[in-house]
From Swiss-Prot:
InterPro entries: Anti-adapt_IraD, IraD/Gp25-like. Its main location: cytoplasm. HAMAP family: IraD (MF_02010). It comes from Escherichia coli O157:H7. Belongs to the GpW/Gp25 family. IraD subfamily. Inhibits RpoS proteolysis by regulating RssB activity, thereby increasing the stability of the sigma stress factor RpoS during oxidative stress. Its effect on RpoS stability is due to its interaction with RssB, which probably blocks the interaction of RssB with RpoS, and the consequent delivery of the RssB-RpoS complex to the ClpXP protein degradation pathway. GO terms for molecular function: anti-sigma factor antagonist activity. GO terms for biological process: cellular response to oxidative stress; DNA damage response. This is Anti-adapter protein IraD. Transmembrane segments: none annotated.
Length: 130
């Protein structure tokens, strides 16, 4: 009897830990992006890259930006096993990115969307992370 009740409780505890891990990673990433003393290269945390104003549709520069951001985030966040960075919007004054994250010890992908807004990064998805 005792063994059956433990089996029923363990998945819920594991799910709570996974949810806490996901929220912690997203919160830490948002803090990293918005920190004035961030260890990320200034190009990646200043919001609108300089090239964006002059070449908003340059796919090579957008790809380079995503690769640089991916490399920096993988270096600074050890809980990320795999990461894909996508530009959702890249216009003259709008920058929105989507991070597709696989965490260690988590079988489900995590999507974390960030938008540059009024001089800082905000998350469109942090409240919905579970």
């Amino acid at each position: 009897m005792m063994r059956q009740s433990l089996q029923a409780v363990l998945p819920e505890i594991s799910g709570n830990k996974t949810s806490l891990l996901r929220k912690s990673v997203c919160s830490d990433l948002l803090t990293l992006f918005n920190s004035p003393h961030s260890t990320l290269p200034s190009l990646l945390v200043s919001g609108m890259p300089e090239w964006q104003v002059h070449n908003p549709s340059d796919k090579h520069l957008q790809s380079w930006y995503c690769r640089q951001l991916r490399s920096a985030l993988l270096f600074h966040e050890p809980r990320i096993a795999a990461l894909q960075v996508n530009l959702k919007e890249a216009y003259c004054h709008t920058l929105a990115i989507s991070l597709e994250i696989m965490l260690y010890h988590d079988d489900e992908p995590l999507t974390f969307d960030l938008v540059w807004d009024n001089g800082g990064w905000r998350s469109a998805t942090l409240e919905n992370v579970s």
